[in-house]
């Protein structure tokens, strides 16, 4: 189950042009976004650790997204 709130995901889909969005559609997208975010976060943590830091910085996130 996704930890991301459904309402903001619903708004994103509407912003993309949808007139109506089913709750299930918003849940599915939220789950996918959460999986992708977790993947990026894990890469960013590894980058921070490699640099000898415990703190994940924006640069780690940016590099993780690019890789």
UniProtKB/Swiss-Prot annotation:
Gene inactivation effect: Cells can be transformed but grow about 75% as well as wild-type in liquid culture, some differences in transcription occur; double histone deletions (htkA and htkB) cannot be made.
Subcellular location: Cytoplasm; Chromosome
Region (Interaction with DNA): 20-22, 54-57
GO MF terms held by the record: DNA binding; protein heterodimerization activity
Pfam name, any one: CBFD_NFYB_HMF
Entry-linked CDD domains: HFD_archaea_histone-like
Induction profile: After 17 hours growth at 85 degrees Celsius HTkB/HpkB is expressed about twice as abundantly as HTkA/HpkA (at protein level).
SUPFAM superfamilies assigned to the protein according to its UniProt record, in alphabetical order: Histone-fold
Keyword presence, Cytoplasm: yes
Chain ranges passing through the membrane: none
Annotated Gene Ontology cellular component terms: chromosome; cytoplasm
Quaternary organization: Homodimer or heterodimer. Dimers then assemble into higher oligomers, with the DNA wrapped around the protein core. Higher order oligomerization of these structures can give rise to long, superhelical fibers (in vitro).
Family of this protein: Belongs to the archaeal histone HMF family.
Additional notes on this entry: In a chromatin histone fraction 83% of the protein is this histone. Cells have about 2.5 x 10(6) histone proteins per cell, enough to coat all DNA with a ratio of >1 histone dimer for 30 bp of DNA, cells are polyploid with 7-19 genomes per cell.
NCBIfam families found in the cross-reference section: archaea_histone
PANTHER family: ARCHAEAL HISTONE A
Function: Binds and compacts DNA (about 120 base pairs per nucleosome, corresponding to four histone dimers) to form nucleosome-like structures. Histones block elongating RNA polymerase (RNAP). HTkB/HpkB has higher DNA affinity than HTkA/HpkA and compacts DNA better than HTkA/HpkA. Participates in both transcription activation and repression in vivo.
Protein name: Archaeal histone HTkB
């Amino acid at each position: 189950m996704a930890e991301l709130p459904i309402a903001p995901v619903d708004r994103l889909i509407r912003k993309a042009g949808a007139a109506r969005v089913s709750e299930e559609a918003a849940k599915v997208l939220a789950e996918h976004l959460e999986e992708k975010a977790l993947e990026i976060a894990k890469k960013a943590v590894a980058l921070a650790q490699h640099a000898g830091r415990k703190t994940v910085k924006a640069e780690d996130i940016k590099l993780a997204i690019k890789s």
